Structure formats: structure tokens, C-alpha cells
């Protein structure tokens, strides 16, 4: 059975994007690093900011691509190749429009669902056989509003809900790392 060796937090690089809904993946890995007293260092060769942590006695690389969302797969594939990490050993954390704020879901494989970061990762890895932790940000109501919505900051109430979802996901990280997926899915997917 595989174990997770890399956690990718999707988002866009730059202060103007740091607090936007599209960067909730980055928020997630930043919280893991903070909880483990680690900081990220820039790795231009691998097109990312990297931190290394130990989760339940497993060495895990935290990756924040510095390529912008639409080319996240470049960094993911470079890091995976450098550390010899298989797609099944990767957890990608990202924003999800089709899930309410405060909700979080775990998924293995599947399509990109219009998410450009996932599309890029699928293309660069040549597979969609990796785990995803989908953090709900809610939907603006009409597809014409999506681009502005994901690139804007959440309300204070929505930010609290998203932070709560992140904390909830981190509570299950040991089991996710060790591929104990069924109990995690059962708990996360039950209201």
C-alpha cells in the first residue's frame, strides 16, 4: 500500500493572490508547515516553494508551485521526478466550487472538473491517479462569475468556514498519509 510522500497546495504566487479563494490549497500546506515549525524555501529549479515535514513518522514534502495555477503540473512533475515520488503518493489540496464553504472531501483520481491546476497536473503527470483533498469554497451561482469569484477574498464568515475545513482536514492527515482512506471519507463526507 502506498503512503503519501508529497502534499501539493494549489494557488497563485504573489501577495495579491495570497488571501483569495483559489489559494486555499496553499493555506492548507502553510498550516501544516506552521504546525510543524517549518518554513518554505524557494526552489527555482523545481518551480516551487518547498518544506519538509514528518507526519506520523513519514517524511513528506510540502509543495507550493510558483508557476501560477494554470501551470502547476510543471512543478508537481519536477518534484515527483526529483524525489522519485509516484502519482499515487501525491496528495493535491485545492479549492472546490461544487462544495459548500466549510466542507472538505477526499477523492482518488477523477477528472479535473474545469480546475486548471488539476488539468495541468493531469497533463504533466500523464495520469489522474493521485489523491485530492477538495476544500469547499462554494459557488457564485453562475459560471460567468467564477473567475472573479475564485480570485477574490472570501467574506469573514466564509474564511472562518474554510479555516475550519482546513483544521478538519489536518485532523485526518495521519490516516490520509497512511492510505487509510475509507474511514476518512466516511467521516468527512457525512454531515
Swiss-Prot record:
The record marks 12 as: Discriminates between blocked and unblocked aminoacyl-tRNA. One of its GO terms (cellular component) is cytoplasm. One of its GO terms (biological process) is protein quality control for misfolded or incompletely synthesized proteins. InterPro entries: Pept_tRNA_hydro, Pept_tRNA_hydro_CS, Pept_tRNA_hydro_sf. The lineage of its organism: Bacteria, Pseudomonadati, Pseudomonadota, Gammaproteobacteria, Thiotrichales. Keywords: Cytoplasm, Hydrolase, RNA-binding, tRNA-binding. The keyword Metal-binding does not apply. Monomer. SUPFAM superfamilies: Peptidyl-tRNA hydrolase-like. Its EC number is 3.1.1.29. Disulfide bonds: none annotated. Belongs to the PTH family. This is Peptidyl-tRNA hydrolase. TRNA binds at residues 17, 68, 70, 116. Hydrolyzes ribosome-free peptidyl-tRNAs (with 1 or more amino acids incorporated), which drop off the ribosome during protein synthesis, or as a result of ribosome stalling. Catalyzes the release of premature peptidyl moieties from peptidyl-tRNA molecules trapped in stalled 50S ribosomal subunits, and thus maintains levels of free tRNAs and 50S ribosomes. The record marks 95 as: Stabilizes the basic form of H active site to accept a proton.
Amino acid at each position: 500500500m502506498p503512503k503519501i510522500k508529497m502534499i501539493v497546495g494549489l494557488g497563485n504566487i504573489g501577495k495579491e493572490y495570497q488571501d483569495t479563494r483559489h489559494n486555499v490549497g496553499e493555506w492548507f500546506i502553510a498550516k501544516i508547515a506552521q504546525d510543524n515549525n517549518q518554513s518554505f524555501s524557494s526552489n527555482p529549479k523545481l518551480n516551487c516553494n518547498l518544506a519538509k515535514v514528518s507526519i506520523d513518522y513519514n517524511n513528506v514534502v510540502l509543495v507550493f508551485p510558483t508557476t501560477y495555477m494554470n501551470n502547476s503540473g510543471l512543478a508537481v512533475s519536477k518534484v515527483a521526478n526529483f524525489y522519485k515520488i509516484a502519482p499515487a503518493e501525491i496528495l493535491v489540496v485545492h479549492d472546490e466550487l461544487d462544495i459548500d464553504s466549510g466542507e472538505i472531501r477526499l477523492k482518488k483520481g477523477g477528472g479535473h472538473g474545469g480546475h486548471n491546476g488539476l488539468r495541468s497536473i493531469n497533463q504533466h503527470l500523464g495520469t489522474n491517479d493521485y489523491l485530492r483533498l477538495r476544500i469547499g469554497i462554494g459557488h457564485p451561482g453562475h459560471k460567468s462569475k467564477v473567475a472573479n469569484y475564485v480570485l477574490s477574498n472570501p467574506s469573514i464568515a466564509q474564511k472562518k468556514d474554510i479555516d475550519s475545513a482546513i483544521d478538519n482536514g489536518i485532523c485526518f492527515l495521519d490516516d490520509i498519509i497512511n492510505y487509510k482512506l475509507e474511514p476518512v471519507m466516511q467521516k468527512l463526507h457525512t454531515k
